[in-house]
UniProtKB/Swiss-Prot annotation:
It comes from the Eukaryota. Residues 431-442 have a biased composition (Acidic residues). Belongs to the FAM135 family. Residues 431-489 are annotated as: Disordered. Signal peptide: none annotated. Residues 443-462 have a biased composition (Polar residues). PANTHER family: LIPASE ROG1-RELATED-RELATED, PROTEIN FAM135B. Coiled coil: none annotated. Pfam families: DUF3657 (PF12394), DUF676 (PF05057). It comes from Xenopus laevis. This is Protein FAM135B.
Amino acid sequence: MSEVQGTIEFSIELHKFHNVDLFQRGYYHVRASLKASSRIPHRLVATLVGQTDDPGPYPPCVYDNVVYSRMFQILYRNEDIDINDVMAFKVHLLLDGERVEDALSEVDFQLKLDLHFTDSEQQLKDMSAVPLISSRTLGLYFHPTSGLHHHVPVMFDYFHLSVISVTVHGSLIALHQPLISFARPVKASWLGKSGQELVTDNTSISMENLVFGSAYCKPPSSEGSYVPSEDCIQHAYKWHKDLCQLLLSAYSALGLCHANVLKEIPDLPHSEIEELPTERTLSQLCNQLQLLSDPEEITEQISKDLAWLRSQLLITWSHFLETVTLQPDVTSYLMQEHHTLRVRRFSEAFFYTEHEKPAVLTFQENLIQSQSNLSTEIRNSEYLAALPPLPIECLDIDGDWNSIPIIFEDRYVECPRKDYITDNALAEPANEDECEFSEESPSENTHVGSKPHSIQSTTVHENASFEKPNVGTKAQEDCSTEGPEQGFDHNQEATSVESEFVADFTPLPIPPSETSDSGAKLSLSALNEDCDQVTRCYQEPKRTPGVTYIKVKPQSQDQYKGETVLIVSSQYGNSLSLANSEAPQSESETMNSNNGMRTYEHIALHEISSTKNELISTLKSQKSRQCSHILLKSSSTELIRNSTEDTLMVKSCPRDIYEKSSLFASGCIKRSSSVISDSGIESEPSSVAWCDVHNRRMDLNSDKDLLLQLSKQHWAYGNSLEGDHMESNTSLPSGIQASLASINSLPFEEEDREMELSKLTKSVSAPQISSPEETLNDLLNNKLVGEIIHSLKKCSSEEKEEESQTAMNYYNNITNDIISELANDTHNTNGTKSPESSLANVFIQGLIPNSESGVIDDYIFNDPVVPKADDFPSVHQETILCDLNSTDDQNILDHSNKMEHVAKACSFSADPLVDVNSITHTSFSVIAPAKEIFEDFPVLHEIELSEDSVESIDQSIDNYYHELYSIEKEVSNNRTDGASELEETSASLSTVRVLERRKGVELVNLSVSCTATCLPFSSMQKDTPVIPGFSTKQALFPITRQPLGSFEVNSSNSNTDEESNERMLSFHQAKDKFRKELKFEGFLYSDQPVLASDVPYFPPEEEQTEDGIHLVVCVHGLDGNSADLRLVKTFLELGLPGANLDFLMSEKNQTDTFADFDAMTDRLIDEIVQHIQLYNLSISRISFIGHSLGTIIIRSVLTRPRFRYYLNKLHTFLSLSGPHLGTLYSNSTLVNTGLWLMQKLKKSGSLLQLTFRDNADLRKCFLYQLSQKPGLQYFKNVVLVASPQDRYVPFHSARIEMCKNATKDRHTGPVYTEMINNLLQPVIDSKDCTLIRHNVSHALPNTANTLIGRAAHIAVLDSELFLEKFFLVAGLGYFK
C-alpha cells in the first residue's frame, strides 16, 4: 500500500478572555492542545507565532506541544482581558495514497481548551503546576478542499462562568512522499499485554514505488532501462492527478477565502495572491506528464509538480495569515457567522402554535397529548439524528441530537395565524384597516372545513427587510398580530380550499397622450367593463384593488413556497406605456392620493385541486375584464410529481398620469433542486442549477426588453424539450453544492441576492421546461402582448442592423411555434372555435419587426451586485471557451477583445449555444466577472514560475524541509538516512530552481468547469443598501462555508466533500419526511426568516438602544438563593448587549423561603423599592423572572399598593415552573409525601398555602384570593414555562390550565376552574397582553433526580442548552 505524507496547519488565535461571573479573584491562564485520531499515524508540532505586545511577567510558552497562554489577573466583574496569543499546530499525517482526500477528511481533530487558576503567587513560578478548574473540548470539522475558517466563543462551566474567544484557520499545506517516521499503534496481544507503539521508518519506500505502485520493480542500473507496464503508468497518472487536484483545491479555497475577506474588509493590509484555475492547471500538469515515457522522467516530473504546488500553497497560506491574523474586523465577521449558524441550529425542534385568546380557558388535553407524542417521535426520528454539527462545536454548550431539548410554544393572540398572508410591506400598517382580506368568490368551489394555505411575499427586497416579525393574518378575518409567519400544517395535505382574491380596478383618468421613448403608444381601450366588487374587508367594506387570486404551484426549492408568475394587469381607460417605465419604489403598502389605488405585492399560496386549464377558464370567466397577461407560467412540479398546489405572483400598480409601470416575472422550472430550504433561511442555488431569477421581479425599461424576455423564455423552452433531460428533484449529481443556512443560510439571506447572482450564472445542467399550451394560451388571452410587440416596429428602427439576422431568427422560430400551437388550439374541448384564435394575426403581425431587430445584444442587465462595466450576465461557459480557444494567446490577453466575445456570447440567438444532448455530461459553475475570467485564461502565465518568484519559493520549501528534518532529528537521533534525504530534497529543489518557463501544451479534454476560479454564491459581495430596521450585522454574509456544519452545502470549489453534501441533503430529506408524517398543527421556528437573536455575544461595539433602565427582577424558589438564576441573567445579558438591563437578583428571602407568602412579599417589594431608590434608577420598564415558588411571590407583589406606581412599566413576566394553581392535583405521590413531611418539619406557611390547607374554605385560601386580584394583565408578555417531566410542580399548574382530574372533581374542581378564570380572563380582555405557554421536553439522564422529577424542575435554571435555545430562538424577543 502506497502512503503519502500530508501536512495540515491550524492557526489558532486566543483573542479575549471575558469574565462573565467568576467567583474568585486571582491568576488565570488558558492552555490549548490539539489532538488527532490515534488510528491515523501522525506527528504534531506546536509553536507560538511572534509576540508583538508585552506579554508581562508570565509570557506564553509551549510545553510538550501544549501552548500556555500568558498569565493574567482577574480583579473585577465583567472584566475583559486581551490575550492575543497566536499559535500554530502542524499535523503531519501518514495517509493511504489511494484515498488521500477521504483519509484527510476522516481525521478527528479536537482542540482542547483548559482553564487554570491560582490565587497563590508561589505557584506562578511553575506554570505547569497551576491547577485545572475547567475544560472544554472543541470538535474541528476539517475538509482539505475547503479548509476551516471559523470563530467561536467558548464558555466554561456553570461554576466558572467565563468565555475565551477563539479563531481557527486551518488548511492543507503539503502532500509528498513520507519524509519522517511515524509511530504506529499495535493491537494488544491475546495474552492481554498492553500494546506497544512500533516505530517504522517509512522513508525507505522509494518514490518510484509510490508513483508506480507496489507492482513496480526498479531494475539495477547494470541491466539497462526498464519499461513499466501500462497499469503502472496509469497508476502514476492517477496518483499524480489526485494529489495535484487536492493541492489545487486547497489552494483555490484558500485564495477564495482571502479574496472574500478583502471584499468585505477592503482596508486590510494584504498581499496579492496569484490565481491558479484548478481545472486548467490540472489539465496542463497532467498533459505535460503524459508526454513523458521514461519512468525516471515521470517520477522526476511528479516530484517537480508536487514541489511547485506545495510552494505555491505555502506562500498563499503565509500571505493569508498575514492578512487575517488578529484583525478585529475579520474576527467580528466570523463571530457573526458562527452566531447565526448556532441560533439557526437551535431553532430546530422548536415548535410554535397560535390559538385564539379564549382558547386559553379551555381544556386542551388533545394538544398536550399530541405534543407529548410528537416529542417522543422526534427523539427517535431521523430528523433529529441527522442534525449536522457546527464547523467547530462543543457538545457541552452546543449539544447534539441526543441532548438538545424539544420545545413547544403555544401563543394565545387576538387573531391566530393558522393560514397566513405574510407581506413585509404590511409589517407596520398605518392602521389596522390597511390589512384587508377578501371573501371567497361564489364562483369557486370551496371545500368545507378545509384550510387555506399560506400566502407569502416574494418581492425582491422584502425577505431582507424584517424590521420585526411580519404581520400575518388569518384568511377571511380582519385582524393582525405580530410574530413569525412561515410554517407548515400537515393536515393541509388532506384538505384543500379555493379561496379567491379578485382584483378590482377603478378606472383612472386617461392622459391626453402617453408615448414611450421610442414613439410606441399603447392603447388598452378594448376592455370597457368595470370589475365587480368581490374583495371586501370585514371591518371596513372598501375596495382592495390589486389583489387577484390565481392558482399557483409549489416551488421546487421549498414545498411551502410557490413558484412565481407575474401578471401585468391594467384597466379600461388607462393608457400604459411600457417604455421608460419603472417599478414602484416603495416596498410598503402605499396609497395613491389621486386615484385611490393601493399597491400590493404578494404570492397567494393555496392548496387547490384544479389544473392550469381550469385556471385559464377561471380567468376568462371573471366578470372583471381586466387585461391579464401571464407571460410565462411554471409547470415544474406537474412534470415532476402530481401536485395540487399552484403559485402565481400578482401585481397591481398605482397608475396615474405621470407614472407608468411594467413588470415581468415568470416561474420557470428547475430540473435539479439545488436548494433544500432549511430553517427558514433563504437557501442559495446550486452552482450548477438554474438560479431562480424568473421567480423574482425585474423592471423592463422598454418594449424591447419585454420582447427579449419572451424570446429568452421561448428559447429555454425549446432547448429543454430538445434535450429532454430531467433530474431528480430530491437528489443532486456529483459536484452540486446546495446551501442550507447557515449562514447564508442564515436568516438574513435576501431574495434579491439570489436574483442578482442569477445574472452572473446560467447553468444548462438543469434545463427549463414550460408547458407550451399554457404559455401560449395565456399569451393569446390578451391583446396587450400583440400591441407590445407591434410597437417594437417603431422602437427597433433606431437599432443597429448588424444583429438583425440573429433577432429575426428569434421571431421566426417563435412565430412557427405559435402557428403550430394555434393549429392545435383552434378549437376548444367542445368543438367551438377558441375566441383567442382571433388574436393570432395581431400577435404574429406584431411579433416580426421589419428588418431592424438589433435589440437583443443591446440588452444589458442592471446588476447592482457587479458595478464593473466588464462584468456580464448569463453566459454559457462553452460559448466563451469556444470563442476564446479560437483566438490566439495575444488576443486572449487583450481585454477589449474579450468583451466582444462576451457580448456575442451574451446575445440570445435562435440556435442553441450548446449541444443540448451533452448537457448532462458537462459540469457548470458560477461565472465569475468577465475581467477575472479572462485574466485566468492565459494558462501559461498562471502556472509558470517566474524568475522573480523562484527565490521566495525556494526559501519557503527550504524552510519546510528544514523543519521536517529538525522534527526527525529530535525524535530519532540514531537515524542514518537523514542526510541522504536532504540530498534528495536538495536535488529536487535545484530542479525547481532551473525550471524554465513552462511551454504551452495543447489542452486535451479540458473540462468546461472552472469552479475553483469562480465566486460561490455564499461569498458574493452584497451591495444592496441596508434596509431600516434590519440589523446590519444580520446582513453580513459569511466568508466561507464549512462542509459539515454550516447548514448548507457550499460551492467553494469543484471538489467539495460529497459526504458533507450527502449529510446536508439527508438532513433536509429527513426533515421533509418528518414534516409529511407529522400529525401536528404547528410550525417550526427553523422555518422563520428572523429569530430572536441576531447579534453575537460580545459584539465589538455595543450601542445603547434604550433611554431608560430596563429593570429585571429575578426571584428564586423554595429553599433557593440569589444565585439560582445566574445563567438566566447571563444569557439575557449576553443576548441583549446594549439593552440597558439592570438585574436585581433577589436575596431577601433566601434565608427563609418557608415563611408564608405575605411575609416574603413584603421583603421582595422592600428590596425592589430600595434598589431603585439606592441607585437612583430611571426605570422605563420592569420585567420579572421567577422560578417555582418565586412566581407566586412576584404575583403577590403586583397586588400591593406600594407597587401601584410601577404597574404601567411592567413588560414581561417569565414564569419558570411556577405553581400558580398550587399542588392540588399533583400526580406524584412521592413528591406529595415529601412536601407534607417538609411542611411538618419546617412549619412552612408557604407549603401550607401551596397545598390549599391554609383554610378550610378553599375560596378563602391564599392562592384563590390572589387569583381574584389583578396582576398578569399589566404585562405585555406573560410567558409560562413548564415541563411534564417536572414532578415537583404539576404541569397544568405551571401552565395555568385545566387538568383532567379537576374536571372530574365536583368538590374542588369548580374552585379550580374559578381560579383559572380569575387569572386568565383579565389577560384575555387585555389587548396589550399576550400569553405564551411553553412545553419543554428535556433530554435527561436516567438518574434518581430524573425519576422524582427534580432534574426537570431545576433544568430551567442550570441547563445551558435549554436556556440558550429558549432565549436565542424566541425568549430574547420578550425582553426587547
